[in-house]
């Protein structure tokens, strides 16, 4: 079958779709990956066929213009579990409107969607797999009659909030309802002669890469799939020093791809943090961009600073990892049974870090304020290294992940679902 994989142009979001694209290709299916031109090199470096569509997004500027109150709540989404009273109609309408204008419609700009639809109408995919924010893929599937699947890289906070929004929205008269996301998608679909349907929000089914203990319960069709690490542009090379026994616990300090590429960061200053962690009886490996190394103070001999390193290469040798809470870093550490100290501060990172702590596989340390000083990070890391319970908790999550089918094993299920959901030939709006 023909499979169109779609992800907006950001490496961290693209990396999560690569192993499934490989699996589909290895099973003999024809795979194309559509995104804005900025992602083309990343797609082709992954050994996949790129379809550049539209113009590059300017999402960082748009996000910077968001209303501070709404932005702050989305940066710290613990309100989902701990402050449900905030999830009222006024807040949900405002946040949906703000995110639609400043995020969803930016990363799925009109030119990107239009050219993606044009390509799909020409190529006729049987299945469209879309990264959960890349609604352009959902639109292309809806217009052409392809089956469509959302591919999650983290807990499904989006649909959890969306479902709550739909619940409170339908408690008020129709004339008072304001759903900016549905309005934007309806307008976009109508431009291409298609109608809105719930699958444009949720897919015909969802492919979930999270371990069961971190998933939200849902009645929607879901295909569990094991997370397989792919670190994108970071060279997957095993350096000679990695094969040597350090003689003490090895600790990795990493900011992750998104933090390094966007400048958004929740970690304390690298030099201060490294100097403090180096006081522990551990070998410290830190990924620090070359331009930032000049500002580092002299560091002791137990600190090794590298520009970049594939996580799946180094983490199996580590006793702990300190990071920003990002999806790829979190999941790669979990897959290798490595205890984590997560300095999470935004989006689903906060929820994922909280679950990590609840499951006894690490510690969640919010990075802002006095809570995450370099000394506090050092002390909590010492706790993670000293207490065996953290490695036991990490081992339990690893076991969950290993029991989940790998990407290659879910391909037959995707074939069956595609046959069930795709429109018969010639019945799409564009055919």
From Swiss-Prot:
SUPFAM superfamilies: UDP-Glycosyltransferase/glycogen phosphorylase. Residues 1-23 form the signal peptide. InterPro entries: EryCIII-like_C, EryCIII-like_N, Glycosyl_450act, Glycosyltransferase_28, UDP_glucos_trans. CDD domains: GT1_Gtf-like. GO terms for biological process: daunorubicin biosynthetic process. One of its GO terms (molecular function) is UDP-glycosyltransferase activity. Pfam families: EryCIII-like_C, EryCIII-like_N. It catalyses: dTDP-beta-L-daunosamine + epsilon-rhodomycinone = rhodomycin D + dTDP + H(+). Keywords: Antibiotic biosynthesis, Glycosyltransferase, Signal, Transferase. Pathway: Antibiotic biosynthesis; daunorubicin biosynthesis; Antibiotic biosynthesis; carminomycin biosynthesis. The keyword Signal applies. Its EC number is 2.4.1.-. It comes from the Bacteria. Involved in the biosynthesis of the anthracyclines carminomycin and daunorubicin (daunomycin) which are aromatic polyketide antibiotics that exhibit high cytotoxicity and are widely applied in the chemotherapy of a variety of cancers. Glycosylation is a prerequisite for biological activity of anthracyclines and requires DnrQ which seems to act as an activator. NCBIfam families: glycosyl_450act. Belongs to the glycosyltransferase 28 family. PANTHER family: STEROL 3-BETA-GLUCOSYLTRANSFERASE (PTHR48050), STEROL 3-BETA-GLUCOSYLTRANSFERASE UGT80A2 (PTHR48050:SF13). This is TDP-daunosamine transferase DnrS. The lineage of its organism: Bacteria, Bacillati, Actinomycetota, Actinomycetes, Kitasatosporales. The gene is dnrS.
